[in-house]
């Protein structure tokens, strides 16, 4: 995995050995941050990477100017790898081994951007959206990004879809709370 932009552009990160982790493709990462850049100033903003897996989205966020990174994953090996990669870059962040939905039920921090990329064959994206709207974790004018398999049904009740993109077998949705 290689960071595609910002301060740490072209820096290589250690990839997870486990096949269950699917790092977001570089062209998708570039698109995400180009779209975000057109909508918000990254300075003094917090990026929450739910279902962090490889953590590449959070590292891209810090590289491109976000001030704070929170990465949540329930796999201890993934969290260990995230901490190693953060250390190699000299990045401070919160790397938490915890269930993402439980984290959303009792958030410790307010955030500006939430990236949701759960395992594709689950309903975790919809469940996460329910928790976000119910528990007030997102700052005013915050943005949620969901990466999901193409044709996956997402319930946008309570949200406004501000942008939708398709990249082969995956869709990206950019949302705000209505």
Feature names for model-found ranges:
Residues 1-178:
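Class I S-adenosyl-L-methionine-dependent methyltransferase catalytic core
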